[in-house]
């Protein structure tokens, strides 16, 4: 299956034919299209300081880059910036006649292979993908992680080991939490052996467990846990609440629901807390976004939660953590709200 995440895709074209192809693609997919001042048309942005400079800026700000032109041009421009398959953006190259779509960089973890297939399907072109798992018609651990927006404590090592096992035709099992069945059904799991029951494993060389849980039973084979980011935390706190206290209480709340900390997807609060140092540091430490909502937006859902007159007077709404978690999870809340030392934390699940 192709799972494309077109959050921010930059496209670069250098010829009239490239501009024409870019216009075809832009009509079907959200793109930011760049070209030279000479070729610029409505909907295109001119290069800032030249093609190479613009492309290199985009490499650090977009999740995917598409180049219409020669592969060598893309390679020479981006070579100084290429760093790591887990952090570099997806890079795809298309010839200006739209006959070949080439996955150049970050095929699995960055999603370039999925984007390549998607673009090729749109254009009726030939997708050119060279990663070993794909040419052997198998998925890959980093592809699965990308499709599930999942994390792992040592993904780099696991990807190297598991992908090698897959292409060597070893038996790698795949088990998942029951509540993730629908999502797994939308992922590419070719090459993995589905496992229904951890207590009754088939003959396996290794096992991948896709789970939000903070622990797993003892297993008789080498195994890794892949944790989808699905948990959100609405947090209210007093001004200048220290980061260590916030981190301790969040960890306790996750533990109370038997959730792996890696499952955290976002932290939310009221707009007044946008500059709160402890919350900013907490989100940074957890490597998740810190999202804030206006008091007006939170008030729409505060009737679902106990309120505080003091909090209402201070921030304009009687409850912060509950409504914030509600907005982040569309009302899919988990457990009871933690209230301690001026901090409130409400958890939810967002898909």
From Swiss-Prot:
Keywords recorded for this protein, A-Z: Cobalamin biosynthesis, Hydrolase
SUPFAM superfamilies: CbiG N-terminal domain-like, CobE/GbiG C-terminal domain-like
Ranges that cross the membrane: none
Catalysed reactions listed for this entry: Co-precorrin-5A + H2O = Co-precorrin-5B + acetaldehyde + H(+)
NCBIfam families (UniProt xref): PRK05788.1-1
GO biological process: cobalamin biosynthetic process
Pfam families per record: CbiG_C, CbiG_mid, CbiG_N
Similarity comment text for this entry: Belongs to the CbiG family.
Protein name per Swiss-Prot or TrEMBL: Cobalt-precorrin-5A hydrolase
E.C. code: 3.7.1.12
Keyword Membrane attributed: no
InterPro entries for the chain: CbiG_hydrolase, CbiG_mid, CbiG_N, CobE/GbiG_C, CobE/GbiG_C_sf, GbiG_N_sf
Protein's gene: cbiG
UniProt keyword Chloroplast present: no
């Amino acid at each position: 299956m192709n799972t494309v995440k077109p959050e921010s895709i930059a496209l670069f074209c250098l010829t009239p034919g490239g501009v024409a192809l870019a216009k075809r693609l832009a009509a079907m997919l959200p793109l930011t299209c760049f070209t030279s001042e000479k070729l610029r048309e409505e909907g295109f942005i001119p290069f800032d300081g030249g093609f190479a400079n613009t492309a290199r800026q985009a490499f650090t700000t977009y999740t995917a880059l598409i180049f219409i032109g020669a592969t060598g041009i893309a390679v020479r421009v981006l070579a100084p910036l290429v760093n790591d398959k887990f952090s570099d953006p997806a890079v795809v190259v298309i010839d200006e006649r739209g006959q070949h779509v080439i996955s150049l960089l970050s095929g699995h973890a960055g999603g370039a292979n999925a984007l390549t297939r998607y673009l090729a399907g749109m254009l009726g072109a030939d997708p050119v993908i060279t990663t070993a798992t794909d040419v052997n018609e198998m998925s890959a651990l980093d592809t699965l992680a990308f499709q599930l927006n999942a994390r792992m404590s040592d993904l780099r090592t696991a990807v190297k080991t598991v992908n090698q096992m897959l292409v060597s035709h070893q038996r790698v099992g795949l088990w998942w939490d029951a509540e993730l069945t629908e999502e797994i059904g939308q992922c590419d799991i070719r090459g993995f052996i589905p496992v229904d029951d951890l207590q009754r494993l088939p003959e396996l060389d290794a096992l991948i467990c896709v789970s939000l849980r903070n622990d797993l039973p003892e297993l008789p084979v080498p195994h890794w846990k892949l944790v989808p980011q699905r948990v959100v935390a609405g947090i209210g706190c007093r001004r200048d609440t220290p980061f260590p206290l916030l981190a301790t209480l969040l960890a306790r709340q996750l533990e109370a629901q038997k959730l792996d900390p890696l499952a955290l997807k976002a932290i939310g609060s009221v707009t007044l807390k946008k500059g709160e140092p402890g919350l900013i540091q907490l989100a940074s430490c957890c490597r998740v976004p810190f999202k804030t909502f206006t008091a007006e937006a939170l008030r729409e859902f505060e009737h679902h939660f106990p309120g505080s007159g003091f909090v209402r007077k201070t921030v304009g709404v009687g409850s912060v953590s509950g409504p914030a978690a509600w907005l982040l999870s569309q009302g899919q809340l988990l457990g009871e709200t933690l209230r301690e030392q001026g901090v409130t934390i409400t958890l939810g699940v967002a898909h």
